[in-house]
Amino acid sequence: MIYTLKDGHTPLDVFLPASYWNDELMYYKQVENIVSGGLSKGWFGYNEMHGNIYPFAVWSPAILLPWILWGKIFGWNLVAPVVSSIVFNMVALAIFAGIVKPSVKESVFFLGLLAVFVPYTRYLLCGMPEAIYMALGILFMGLSICYCRKPDRKILIFLFAIVMFATLARPYWGLFFLWVWWFAVRKYNWRGFILGLFAVIATVGIYAWISQTCTAPYLEESVQT
């Protein structure tokens, strides 16, 4: 710390918040390249893999989109992953409070749950994008509560959009299609079913394209030793 201050810098100028994995550096460099040059350059991933067309290794480029947007607007530096994740979650919590309007007791309970959920704080303070999708989860939950109180077509569309985008980034989000699809069918009957089916098919199609062109599987899974 003293050495960096000697040269007029702070530790934040030379330190990338990281956890136990090497993902953080790879994510950071991919976003840096996209923000500055329009496309990730080089070979990335645990085994330096490359997709058929684009160099995103085992990670879907959809994961990086919120950070890319942040980098284009505010710039991209070593602390940008943490700062942006904190801001995204602050915005999500503010929207949640504004649309759900929880009581003081409910607010304390909700914030208490977040406080004791260690992975939430941990991902906020490292270079992993999971905190962004936790923010989407908070927003999704708030919109779901609003829809349960008063079904609205715009809210339903927002819910589908969140699940579609998040599924492209983290496939486990696909489970939430069942929740939103149920909303659609309950309100619009067969039209809701068609809407949900279209959303699922579109997401699967885009994900298949990403998997074939942008990403590559782990090398060790195809090598026998």
List where the protein language model places each region.
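Membrane-lumen/periplasm interface segments of specific transmembrane helices
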Residues: N189-T225
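Loop-to-helix entry region of an early transmembrane alpha helix in multi-pass inner-membrane enzymes
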Residues: G51-A57, P61-I68, I73-V91
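Membrane-interface alpha helices of multi-pass inner-membrane proteins
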Residues: I155-R170, F177-W182, V200-A202
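Transmembrane-helix signature of polytopic, membrane-embedded enzymes
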Residues: F96-V118, A135
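Short acidic/glycine- and proline-prone juxtamembrane loop motifs at membrane-interface regions
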Residues: L125-Y133
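Extracytosolic helix-loop segments that constitute the early lumenal/periplasmic catalytic or substrate-binding loops
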Residues: L5-F15, S19-I53, A62
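Perimembrane helix-loop-helix junctions
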Residues: C146-P151, L175-I201
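Membrane-interface transmembrane helices that cradle and orient dolichyl/undecaprenyl
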Residues: K101-V104, F140-L156, A166
